[in-house]
Regions:
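Active-site-proximal, substrate-binding regions of enzyme catalytic domains
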Residues: 2-157
Length: 157
């Protein structure tokens, strides 16, 4: 691995499309991942050479990695809920599942929806925090009013 500046994006999972068109992907992320099924999908010699050159010249830190059975299961179930499962290829599912797996490794399921249209753990936490703040606010305002009223009553005596 070469010394590259941090990009702000830790991990980027590659699909075949940017490699087929030889998009400028170097410098977009700190680390790049690609499922073996996507590498196998690269039948175009230019796309394979492009990926090889990016990696061997140190332009990208690349790891060929599989998503794991649990991540693949979660993505497949979610894709069935959205109705997308029938149109996703095996490499598509592997890209999504690897993205899911990397997110879970880095941050847990905190930022991931479990159901279509559902809220993330982060959103649920924020809603609870705001509700607690809203409930506590009238009580604290009532205490302030009582203190102010008490001060006026004493001043009048």
């Amino acid at each position: 691995m070469t010394d590259r500046p941090a990009t702000g994006i830790e991990s980027l999972v590659l699909d075949a499309a940017p490699l087929l068109v030889q998009a400028r992907i170097a410098g977009l992320a700190d680390k790049y991942y690609i499922p073996a099924s996507v590498v196998a999908e690269l039948r175009d010699a230019r796309a394979r050479d492009y990926l090889h050159t990016l990696h061997t010249t140190g332009q990208i830190d690349l790891e060929v990695r599989e998503p794991g059975a649990e991540a693949l299961k979660m993505v497949m179930e979610f894709a069935k809920q959205t109705g997308d499962y029938a149109v996703l290829s095996k490499p598509d599912l592997h890209v999504l599942a690897l993205t899911y797996a990397l997110e879970v490794e880095a941050h847990g399921t905190w930022r991931i929806r479990q159901t279509v249209g559902g809220k993330t753990g982060q959103q649920l936490h924020e809603e609870r925090r705001l509700e607690e703040k809203r409930v506590a606010q009238p009580q604290s305002q009532g205490a302030k009013d009582a203190i102010q009223q008490g001060g006026r009553a004493e001043a009048q005596n």
